[in-house]
From Swiss-Prot:
InterPro entries: APP1, APP1_cat, Mg2+_PAP. GO terms for biological process: lipid metabolic process. It is found in: Golgi apparatus. Coiled coil: none annotated. This is Uncharacterized protein C29B5.04c. It comes from the Eukaryota. It comes from Schizosaccharomyces pombe (strain 972 / ATCC 24843).
Length: 605
């Protein structure tokens, strides 16, 4: 979704250099006090600074790759093609609005790309004379008629016609790039508003990082008279993606409200009058001991609908109003935790390029102060496809946990991706630091399990034999499960899962039942026939210290995605130490009471 075509055209364009379009930004980070002894002040402060030096796109002079990128994004999110000249959109049902040139199928294309413009295309027929005017993809039927060219009726010869692409590329791309289904936001907020959001947010896909640029980073402290002074300076060079990172230790300084300020100045500039710099005030200094909340963003605090696929993610990210992406009660829940002196940190697979949009979302959602955020850079479509989401997020989460000293951690995510799997690994690595794991159940909502009523199965004429295997809870009674008799020769084996809560258990305990049904044939020698008999294999796993605060499927479930979620939950419970609770929620109001008790207990100890 974000800029990656440079890898395919390496060397075709000059590397970006510092100019008037160059910008620099600093991302939210926090400092950690270290070396503190009982009854004394800390001796050192761990400084963490992260930023990006990049070049903004020149909207008046976009290259071919940039135009192609925007056009592909338009189709991907369901926007209709935009007219190059007028900025209007053609009607989808009227083919005449897209008609620009009609020629015979024997016409030949002469493409002229000397100026790098895709519209320098001339059409020449085999019967063209010297007096005939040149034809281009921007020649209208009226121009052709005025020059004596016979234009056939498009309704009679649509199969022999060329149409100008609304995306300004070619008729071939018009067939593959015109969205088959328009975005739902066109009908809800209007096409003009969708276009406004798209143009504002899609610019992030065209930003290019500037490598090997030198940045001067200054750390300011504020005294009692509100005067700032520089307490540390660092020179750092940007990496290949344009990012600069500082992880250093400085002597301890007393500052107003225990907050510093950070300024980043780009040392090289083509203009002496313009200094390219970024400034971030109120960078907090956290104690090495305390409680921090590390949360995912997509489908956890922001309704991105990752579970519905990348096309839905692109549509929501680029077109949806920010007030429609909030999740009920989440900001209130986070404010409750910060009122208990917990700090908020975000680790997500969202790209750094989307930070301006995310910052606006957090402000609109009244999210409490963000102490630090860890995102990632999208540097190639191929890498994003091959590299699993868990691998992309694991390193950032590990960096965030290690940078927080000895602080206790509460992990918050969702089951739309692989958050629980990654959090289980972190809990196994830091069993004494993880207080709890909170997972938002978007899978049940997506699958519609709660809306479906389980039909009662009919009893079979034959006796159902139950055979247990791999039962992890011997005390759990085995249960019979039957299905309607169907075509025995064609019906395959079936698998069903069921979550059952054990009554009166502290902490809360669930039993995950697995039923595997299949049919065998038993010979009836008396009647000289073969009768089908259903076999049911049953296994049960005990899930201790699991708290499901939202609605869930209490019946036997055959949905594959829902079954995968149950398996992930059982596997995670086997990896995560039993003293760490796993809490399943959907709305932010549900885990508030549980979280208050958890944090108060942690602070008391």
């Amino acid at each position: 979704m974000f800029r990656s075509f440079g890898r395919l055209f390496r060397g075709s364009e000059e590397s970006p250099t510092i100019n008037d379009l160059t910008s620099i930004t600093i991302y939210p980070q926090c400092f950690i006090s270290t070396g503190k002894e009982y009854g004394s002040e800390p001796k050192h402060i761990s400084v963490h600074v992260r930023g990006w030096v990049y070049e903004n796109p020149d909207l008046n002079n976009l290259g071919r790759k940039d135009r192609l990128m925007l056009n592909l994004l338009r189709r991907y999110v369901g926007l209709p093609p935009k007219s190059k000249e007028t900025g209007t959109y053609p009607e989808k049902d009227d083919e005449n609005t897209n008609l620009q040139v009609v020629v015979d199928t024997k016409a030949q294309l002469n493409v002229n790309v000397n100026d790098g413009k895709p519209n320098d295309i001339e059409l020449s027929s085999t019967s063209k004379t010297e007096n005939d005017p040149p034809l281009s993809l921007h020649t209208t039927p009226d121009d052709l008629q005025g020059n004596g060219v016979n234009v056939p009726n498009p309704s009679l010869s649509a199969s022999r016609s060329w149409y100008q692409s609304g995306y300004g590329i070619s008729g071939f791309f018009n067939r593959i790039m015109t969205p088959s289904v328009n975005s739902q936001y066109i009908s809800t907020i209007g096409l003009a508003k969708c276009e406004e959001y798209f143009e504002e947010r899609s610019l992030a896909s065209l930003q290019r990082g500037l490598k090997d640029e030198f940045v001067l980073v200054k750390i300011y402290a504020t005294d009692k008279n509100f005067e700032q002074k520089v307490v540390a300076e660092f020179n750092v060079a940007t990496n290949v993606e344009g990012y600069f990172i500082i992880d250093e230790v400085i002597p301890f300084y007393t500052t107003k409200n225990n907050k510093f300020s950070v300024e980043a100045v780009l040392l090289q500039s083509t203009s002496e009058d313009k200094v390219i710099k970024a400034y971030m005030s109120e960078v907090p200094v956290l104690d090495r001991n305390g409680i921090s909340i590390i949360s995912d963003i997509d489908d956890t605090v922001k309704n991105t609908r990752v579970i519905e696929g990348p096309r839905k993610v692109g549509e929501t990210t680029l077109l949806a109003p920010l007030n429609t992406q909030t999740i009920e009660g989440v900001s209130d829940w986070f404010r409750v935790m910060t009122n208990l002196n917990a700090t908020v940190h975000f680790v997500s697979n969202s790209p750094w390029q989307l930070w301006p949009t995310l910052s606006k979302f957090f402000t609109n959602d009244n999210m409490p102060y963000i102490s630090s955020i860890y995102l990632r850079h999208f540097n190639g479509v191929l890498q994003n496809i091959i590299e699993p989401a868990a691998a992309r997020k694991r390193s950032s989460l590990l960096t965030a946990i290690r940078s927080l000293g000895d602080r206790k951690i509460v992990l918050i995510g969702d089951n739309g991706e692989q958050d629980l799997q990654i959090y289980a690994e972190m809990a196994a690595c830091f069993p004494e630091r993880i207080l709890g794991i909170f997972i938002r159940d978007v899978m049940s909502d997506f699958c519609g399990v709660l809306k479906k009523q389980t039909t009662k199965s009919n009893s079979l004429p034959e006796v159902v034999q139950t055979k247990p295997f791999a039962t992890s809870t011997p005390d759990t009674p085995l249960k019979e499960f039957t299905t309607t008799l169907k075509d025995v020769d064609n019906e395959q084996a079936s698998e069903f899962y069921q979550l059952e809560k054990e009554p009166d258990t502290v902490p809360s305990t669930f039993i995950l039942h697995r039923y595997y049904t299949y049919r065998i044939f038993v010979e009836d020698r008396a009647n000289k026939t073969r009768k089908p008999v259903v076999q049911v294999e049953h296994a049960a796993s005990k899930l201790e210290n699991v708290h499901i605060l939202c609605d869930y499927c209490k019946h036997k479930c055959s949905n594959i995605m829902e079954q995968d979620w149950f398996v992930q939950l059982a596997r995670a419970r086997g990896v995560i130490p039993l003293h760490i609770p796993i809490v399943i929620w959907f709305n932010g109001e549900e885990p508030i009471s549980f979280t208050e008790d958890l944090l108060k207990s942690a602070f008391a100890s």
